[in-house]
Swiss-Prot record:
Organism expressing this protein natively: Bos taurus (Bovine)
Domain notes: Each subunit contains six transmembrane segments (S1-S6) with S1-S4 forming one voltage sensing domain (VSD) and S5-S6 contributing to form one quarter of an interlocking pore-forming domain (PD). The S4-S5 linker preferentially interacts with PIP2 in the open-state KCNQ2 channel, whereas the S2-S3 loop interacts with PIP2 in the closed state.
Low complexity composition-biased segments: 26-36
Cross-referenced PANTHER family: POTASSIUM VOLTAGE-GATED CHANNEL SUBFAMILY KQT MEMBER 3, POTASSIUM VOLTAGE-GATED CHANNEL SUBFAMILY KQT MEMBER 4
Domain of life according to the entry: Eukaryota
A single MF term (Gene Ontology): calmodulin binding
Name of this protein: Potassium voltage-gated channel subfamily KQT member 3
Originating gene: KCNQ3
Family under the similarity heading: Belongs to the potassium channel family. KQT (TC 1.A.1.15) subfamily. Kv7.3/KCNQ3 sub-subfamily.
Pfam families assigned: Ion_trans (PF00520), KCNQ_channel (PF03520), KCNQC3-Ank-G_bd (PF11956)
Residue numbers bearing the Phosphothreonine modification: 81
Amino acid sequence: MGLKARRPAGAAGGGGDGGGGGGGAANPAGGDAAAAGDEERKVGLAPGDVEQVTLALGAGADKDGTLLLEGGGRDEGQRRTPQGIGLLAKTPLSRPVKRNNAKYRRIQTLIYDALERPRGWALLYHALVFLIVLGCLILAVLTTFREYETVSGDWLLLLETFAIFIFGAEFALRIWAAGCCCRYKGWRGRLKFARKPLCMLDIFVLIASVPVVAVGNQGNVLATSLRSLRFLQILRMLRMDRRGGTWKLLGSAICAHSKELITAWYIGFLTLILSSFLVYLVEKDVPEVDAQGEEMKEEFETYADALWWGLITLATIGYGDKTPKTWEGRLIAATFSLIGVSFFALPAGILGSGLALKVQEQHRQKHFEKRRKPAAELIQAAWRYYATNPNRIDLVATWRFYESVVSFPFFRKEQLDPAASQKLGLLDRVRLSNPRGSNTKGKLFTPLNVDAIEESPSKEPKPVGSNNKERFRTAFRMKAYAFWQSSEDAGTGDPTAEDRGYGNDFLIEDMIPTLKAAIRAVRILQFRLYKKKFKETLRPYDVKDVIEQYSAGHLDMLSRIKYLQTRIDMIFTPGPPSTPKHKKSQRGAAFTYPSQQSPRNEPYVARPSTSETEDQSMMGKFVKVERQVHDMGKKLDFLVDMHLQHMERLQVHVAGFSPSKGASSPAEAEQKEDRRDADLKTIICNYSETGAPDAPYSFHQVPVDKVGPYGFFAHDPVNLPLGGPSSGKGHATPYAERPTVLPILTLLDSRGSYRSQVELHGPCSDRVSPRQRRSITRDSDTPLSLMSVNHEELERSPSGFSISQDRDDYAFGPSGGSSWMREKRYLAEGETDTDTEPFTPSGSLPLSSTGDGISDSIWTPSGKPT
């Protein structure tokens, strides 16, 4: 695009200088459109292309990373910008940017890479230089032979002259090409580059070769002495490795195994000096005799001779110039040779293995370096995929990039007449509106400046709403309705199109949604493609790489598991307590209940304190729950055992009773009912006196298996005593038992004769307490239900507290008892008479949930007032 268009002298150059000075709009008053079109056609531009190029280049200054090229359309006498601005608008440039600056930098970088970092075809040049240096060395060796001295000298002179020109030109190119690096720019940077060791070597070899070539093959003393400098060509072999890769590799191997090498060299040196000293002591006074019997000079005359012998021997060279003569010396030499040779040869093995490992590591590193480009491409594609998300309206930089590279034309109404617009399709209209769009470089969109190309010079120009830079930024932010409306207006030739705002200046706000969707699809495909390429580069290089990957994965898994465990502990563990240490509640040994104390009596008993604090971790809480479940099991076992013992004692008291059978008349049946009521009061009196003398009266249960279908007891109590001291006393219990289930005091059916206090007197009426008498009298309208619990039913109960019986034939009286007794046979733990139909609670709660100290006024019939 670097074409400059000649414009009339009166035309302002602000539009062409938009890249450096901010870019103003072209002045339409500077010349007519025809003259401008002629001038543009002279330089090979279509009408309007000058403004396109100028606008595109002016807007390019705002894009980060674009080249700042000089725009066209500048007048010869136009005043230049006093000072250019750099790429980041921070560093002012002292001179304008050259047109061939990019090409100059590209050639400079290419030469620097070929000389300093040879790859590909550059290796051929370095191979040629190596052959030249090797030929000079061979010819220098041949000059030492008398028969080849003359011929080899002539060829050596020609080859050295050629080598001087080659090396001189190469050195100059190296100094010049070093400017592509920022640290070697300027003359100071060039001096810094020339002070490098290899550059100093090149300078030294060039200086030494010039006088050798100058004197030629002269036979004087000066020429002969200068010819010795030819062997400095050997130093040129060092320049083959400009980057010092071999030396770096050797140094890294030595540094990696420095401890092993120092150990081997240290022990080998000790073996050398000790063996040499002992051999010197033994062999120093032994004279050497030749074949004629004459004494010769001693071989181990000094300690230095012994050190020489020891070094040659332990290094396994063995010149044989010095050997021990005595058997003592030979024995010492053999012993120390076996020890010292192994330590002298050990560094060679260490260096060999170290170099092999380093070479393998370099190959692996090269394999890993191949992942850099796919990784960078994947990161770039991932960001562009994220930035083109339609939901992220705040990310506009990526869309602006596409605005600068995707060309999307506008429509000019002067290019489309009404007849043509009706015949041409949309694609033809697009091509017609931008005839030279395909020839522009860089795919920069250049919106047309209609003001500069008017049909009539006398037509009044319209004011431009925004400058060129703003128009370029929003060039492709056009809505679909604006696009179709503008094309419609341009095709139909509507004179009101300009009034609507779609003639010269489009109200462009956003890109077409279809174009955005296409760009989004391309971003997704590129992201998946780069992701696939990056996964292909992640293939393991060798078995060691596989092991390292598995090890890294295992460590990562362990770290994640540890992190999860820490998070779980943080979730289930409360924060640090604020209570001081000396006031914290401590936990001691597990609390055990006394053998004669019910655990339900005092469930919350303070535990003794110790110096330990409770474990608040998740495992500690599991242990705590398990301990509590174990304690609950022990309590249930205790309750079941106590209840079974209680049932056994009740069975002992009623074992002797046997009810009469075969009632023949209603009178006899009524008499048996009265007798059954008397038996009930007798049992209540007997049980109330079996406990401790000071214990309060309480009602307990009688097993129902002793009750028959035709009487209260399975057998008639023919031998039941109604008086005397033995009738009120039974076997004393070892301790005061407390039943675990609340006793149910339900009276017999209304057929009984408990309707008045007069009928209350029976065989044991004198043994019933006043409270019991009032309770029996008050509840005389309901049958008495004595619960029957055996061991089988306790095992069938899930908790031991809900006790039931499933014998339907247990009934009271000849008629089988009441229906309420068959439905409600048990009272569960925590259940009160509120849950039963005939009773409602009234009064204060009992003193103990076990039945001790039950008030007689608690239970009142639900149908009677108290």
